[in-house]
Amino acid sequence: MRVLLSNDDGVHAAGLKALADAFHGDEVWVVAPDREQSASSHAISLHRPLRLLEVAPRWYAVDGTPTDAVYMGLNLVLRDARPDVVVSGVNHGPNLGNDVLYSGTVAAAMEGALLGVNAVAVSLAAPPPHDFGEAARFAAALARQVVARPPPAPVLLNVNVPPGPVRGYRFARLGRRTYGNEVVEKTDPRGRKYYWIGGEGRVHNEDIPGSDCNTVLLERLAAVTPLHLDGTHDPMFQELRSWTVPGYEKEPAP
């Protein structure tokens, strides 16, 4: 099995090394950002050149975002040797609920799926110090299942693993996870103001049975969530059919 690994914590991150170890015996390729890129979401670098450095055999660093890394991996490094699966992680912390909108880990896997390769994003929902081995082994086992039973269209599975041994898992829906909506103002030594967003990192997880948040944080099970690449809000789409925009014709004839 040929595997492309990436992440958003950087090419030298311990979680990435653990993931590579979990695929021992497979043909493993790594293309990852050359530095920390957490919360970079699906940003892609279109207005500057990128550099690609081979730091070890089959192990590459890109001076860009997680999306850049997977794009380069699939369209350059492995252009003539398509991988069977893209796996992103192991992230240093959870990617639950609303986190997936900001996560570079999830975005790297999403880019793989958008480019036609089944993908898995895996995160360890535990504070440091991190032991990534169990999460990496679970992700590898799941990735092998994805390859063995390929879906009709490329799939993205978002995985969150609690600390310690994985005693079980659940296929879970996204929950709702929000942070303190604060902007912290400070002053630099030259008297100029600067800001941190997000406050002190206070997190609220809504209690939603069957959600990834409940599965991981309350029940201590691994959560596997299939993420849909079509962001259309279908209920609102139907509602909009009854709307009109004054002064404009709806669906005019060509």
From Swiss-Prot:
Q: Cofactor: bound how, per the entry note?
A: Binds 1 divalent metal cation per subunit.
**One of this protein's Pfam families, by short name?**
SurE
What domain of life? Bacteria
Q: Which cofactor does it need?
A: a divalent metal cation
Would you name any one GO CC term?
Answer: cytoplasm
Family designation: Belongs to the SurE nucleotidase family.
- This one is known as 5'-nucleotidase SurE
